[in-house]
Amino acid sequence: MRSDMIKKGFDKAPHRSLLKATGLKDEDFDKPFIAICNSFIEIIPGHKHLNEFGKLVKEAVRAAGMVPFEFNTIGVDDGIAMGHIGMRYSLPSREIIADSVETVVNAHWFDGMICIPNCDKITPGMMMAALRINIPTVFVSGGPMAAGKTSKGDVVDLSSVFEGVGAYQSGKISEEELKDIEDHGCPSCGSCSGMFTANSMNCLCEVLGLALPGNGSILAIDPRREELIKQAAEKLKILIERDIKPRDIVTEEAIDDAFALDMAMGGSTNTVLHTLALAQEAGLDYDMNRIDAVSRRVPHLCKVSPASNWHMEDIDRAGGISAILKEMSRKEGVLHLDRITATGQTLRENIAHAEIKDKEVIHSLENPHSEEGGLRILKGNLAKDGAVIKSGATEVIRFEGPCVIFNSQDEALAGIMLGKVKKGDVVIIRYEGPRGGPGMPEMLAPTSAIAGMGLGADVALLTDGRFSGASRGISVGHISPEAAAGGTIALLEQGDIVCIDVEERLLEVRVSDEELDKRKKEWKRPEPKVKTGWLGRYAQMVTSANTGAVLKIPNFD
């Protein structure tokens, strides 16, 4: 066993003595040592219940004949960090999480790992670590939150609250109505109830094969989560016995399938960023062109909030992720069904008995929302290395208009609230990319303000930053190269005409190459917004969004 490094031989007597101080007995040294990587954090509603959840995981690991050791990672709640400097720490926290898990697990030579993530950057951070460490691993997340209901009976979620702010600002609802939405938008523990980033990544974790069937959709408050925990411990023991590791599971074909599910469900645009980062950790050469190819062959079968009033509890009721995958598998060439997963079985075996129980929630191949996926990769002179749009969250397929430019999210939000943006405009928020932000902050507050003011179908928003999974409308993010790297978005001037063509996958500015070259020669890179601390270091090391915004190791040669 890998853990023999710290527990076997006469020279490991000091190690065993220390381990006995934690409560271990002599008989425990013949069992696998399992890292329980938890993320219990009281300020994050999706993680508040994970302290008790972790205890259940440890009990299940002991029952399976292994020895659990629990530790915690950090985390950032994107909703609470939204709209202020705290959001700059969200994406960088993914790297800290990955590094901290690597540190604890490799320093102590664990034989296997169970990861307990749930929200925002915590799931992808742990997934990156699992691929980097490459020991047998199973993920079991905390589960989605239930949707809420206002006193009037309206179904609401976190995106409803953000959009309520814009609606109140524009006089569409009263302060009492906003308070009603606020009080009922997040009614329980769990990851926010729509197809936002947390739930998108937990669903992708399931199809990648790192988590068990049901992981993405069973609610946090559902007793079936406890059964999932027991199964996770039992399956981990099998993975250890068969020496099946994350890099055996997360192949190019698995990533294809993850993006295929993402396209079928119209998941968060953040999944592109995180899954590209996973490919980097797995040593795979996977780029945005391959994502676009997946998008072209996968129909859009589900619309989940913010694209509709359906939530994760409805997906679960309708058959869960397995039912979606089973329906997708009917179309030849969409999924790779014979690859291994954390169950110890193939994807084909995992979904064999699944079925759609509500075809209003999960559409059939014969009745898709669209013939192509709910996420699309756009390219053009404004995004030579690519950009991402959640096409499933807008009915608009082509938009052209003059740009209104803001050099930060704060500047943009103030401008939107002051009425500087009107119908037909293209809002540009730049210098908010991985390096320029730094940290590539999410733009939920501006998109929600636009939607709340009733302009969601009449105003486009383009940025080198990111969007929350709760964003909707004509929102194009991840524009690469970013402004801080001298990308075309940095060269735009007020009133330039920008064209977004979702059908043709184009993102263009109606300015000649000669004029753009002239502007590039005159452009000067702004001073970094942050020069010290973690964000200062991050800005110096982070790469572009089109490669997952991973950190690069400095070359000292």
Swiss-Prot record:
Under Gene Ontology molecular function, one entry of this record is: magnesium ion binding
SUPFAM superfamilies, alphabetized: IlvD/EDD N-terminal domain-like (SSF143975), LeuD/IlvD-like (SSF52016)
Q: Which residues carry this modification: N6-carboxylysine?
A: 121
Q: Does the keyword Iron-sulfur apply?
A: yes
Q: Name one GO cellular component term.
A: cytosol
The protein in question is named Dihydroxy-acid dehydratase
Tell me which residues bind [2Fe-2S] cluster: 119, 192
Task: Give the family, as the similarity comment puts it.
Answer: Belongs to the IlvD/Edd family.
How is the cofactor bound, in the record's words?
Binds 1 [2Fe-2S] cluster per subunit. This cluster acts as a Lewis acid cofactor.
**Listed InterPro entries:** Dihydro-acid_dehy_C (IPR042096), DihydroxyA_deHydtase (IPR004404), DiOHA_6PGluconate_deHydtase_CS (IPR020558), ILV_EDD_C (IPR056740), ILV_EDD_N (IPR000581), IlvD/EDD_N (IPR037237)
